[in-house]
């Protein structure tokens, strides 16, 4: 974890994964340490926070919110989190970096997210970390925050 990290931008997913639901997935102690913004998936980054310093900022997306992270990805971000994300084939060619952390369970998606595993392989191939877990889709966000952020 980058010790300079101070701003976290989180995109939720569809249906139940609203900003209110995502808020409950983030450990209480994190709210006192970081400036956290949570937005519905599809919200443009510029509408969430106008002035973002990538060196001190994190982009995190769950499910459909993963697409928001992928389309805004830059190696300069302090931390990039992909939580069982929706993906597209074009992102299996992205040059990720050591700032990228992905947790996913391909069995949650069936055939509707066919590029998920190729994106995970690309994350690893280009310097990031991707871990497949055996976990219900709705349980992965809490696990992600508890695993990748420590007091």
Predicted feature locations:
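Conserved alpha/beta-hydrolase
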Residues: 30-43
């Amino acid at each position: 974890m980058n010790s300079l990290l101070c701003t976290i931008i989180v995109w939720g997913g569809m249906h139940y994964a609203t900003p209110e639901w995502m808020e409950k997935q983030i450990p209480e102690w994190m709210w006192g340490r970081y400036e956290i913004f949570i937005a519905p998936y599809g919200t443009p980054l510029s509408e969430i926070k106008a002035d973002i310093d990538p060196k001190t900022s994190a982009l995190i997306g769950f499910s459909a919110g993963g697409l928001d992270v992928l389309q805004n990805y830059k190696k300069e971000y302090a931390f990039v989190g992909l939580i069982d994300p929706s993906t597209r084939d074009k992102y299996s060619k992205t040059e990720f970096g050591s700032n990228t952390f992905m947790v996913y369970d391909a069995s949650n998606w069936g055939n509707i997210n066919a590029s998920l595993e190729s994106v995970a392989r690309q994350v690893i191939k280009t310097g990031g970390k991707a871990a497949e877990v055996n976990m219900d889709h709705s349980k992965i966000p809490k696990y992600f925050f508890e695993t990748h952020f420590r007091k």
